[in-house]
A protein has these predicted regions:
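Catalytic adenosine-cofactor/nucleotide-binding cores of aminoacyl-tRNA synthetases and other
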Residues: 64-203
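Active-site cores that bind ATP or allylic diphosphates and position pyrophosphate for catalysis
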Residues: 1-94, 98, 109, 134
Length: 203
């Protein structure tokens, strides 16, 4: 694992996983390895809760004779704003922040980041710094800057706490750095015909 180094597991602790269901459908463990191989995936980047499955996935690669395994990176979990444990969908309702990218109609219809006025690049910027340090004091990044600055060496092994207020600050900062015309266009798309009651300079 690129982040955690060599991971050793006692083979006696490994159980026999089901690779095919009774209806003939492959399980995740089998399908994801086969798909990643044929898609020529170079890096598998996922949460640390999947680390215990790595030995099994590695053995599936070996059983097929596929020596060109992807590099694995198991990222630290995002933790609750308050209390112990990883962030869950229920925490959004509990602490008053959106969970989904856009509105979601489940048992209860909930608004997403888009409906709350969050810019996509602001949310990506905020999330990128949870568990990763660019090595500088710089916090506000454009997408292209993030691509240039990112490296696995900046990743942390410990979980990062989700801070809704910090998320709002990132969004505020990105809005301030966005041209007025682009902000106006975003408002028009978000509110549809509702924006027509306002003058362009008011937007």
């Amino acid at each position: 694992d690129i982040l955690r180094g060599v991971v050793s597991v006692d083979s006696e602790t490994l159980d026999d996983k089901i690779l095919y269901k009774s209806d003939g459908m492959p399980t995740y463990h089998f399908a994801n390895v086969v798909d990643d191989h044929h898609m020529k995936i170079s890096h598998v980047i996922r949460g640390e809760e999947w680390l215990p499955s790595l030995p099994l996935h590695s053995m599936i690669y070996d059983s097929f004779g596929w020596l060109d395994k992807p590099d694995f990176v198991h990222l630290p979990l995002i933790l609750k704003p308050i209390g112990k444990g990883k962030l869950s969908k229920r925490d959004g309702d509990k602490f008053g922040f959106p969970i989904y990218a856009t509105s979601w109609s489940g048992t209860v219809k909930t608004k997403g980041y888009k409906e709350f006025g969050f810019l996509p690049q602001a949310v990506v910027n905020f999330l990128s710094l949870l568990g990763w340090n660019p090595g500088t004091e710089k916090e506000i990044f454009s997408l292209s800057e993030l691509i240039q600055a990112f490296s696995f060496s900046g990743l942390n092994k410990s979980g990062a706490r989700f801070d809704p207020e910090k998320n709002r600050w990132f969004n505020h900062s990105h809005i301030q750095n966005t041209k007025n015309s682009l902000v106006s266009d975003s408002i028009k798309k978000a509110f549809g015909s509702e924006h027509s009651k306002y003058k362009e300079e008011e937007l």
